């Protein structure tokens, strides 16, 4: 299996048990995301990866939670998405485009 490229990493603040999945913006340098799933047995983590995959049109296999599996603050790596592409997509979503 070929080695993956060096990933782009982003710091997130996750708010589980929300009414719906929603990207809410930046807070203290962290991208804040509401996730509807409960924070038990990895449900919120799986829902986060699913949501990011859908939101950013990136395969789930190319998204990895590197730190914060049991906390709200997480570091997520994207193996097939550049920082520029990530920022452009997030900006467009936050602007409502």
Swiss-Prot record:
Cellular component annotations (GO), alphabetically ordered: cytoplasm
Cross-referenced InterPro entries: DUF167, YggU-like_sf
SUPFAM superfamilies the record matches: YggU-like
Matching Gene3D superfamilies: YggU-like
Family: Belongs to the UPF0235 family.
Name recorded for this polypeptide: UPF0235 protein DET1292
Species the sequence originates in: Dehalococcoides mccartyi (strain ATCC BAA-2266 / KCTC 15142 / 195) (Dehalococcoides ethenogenes (strain 195))
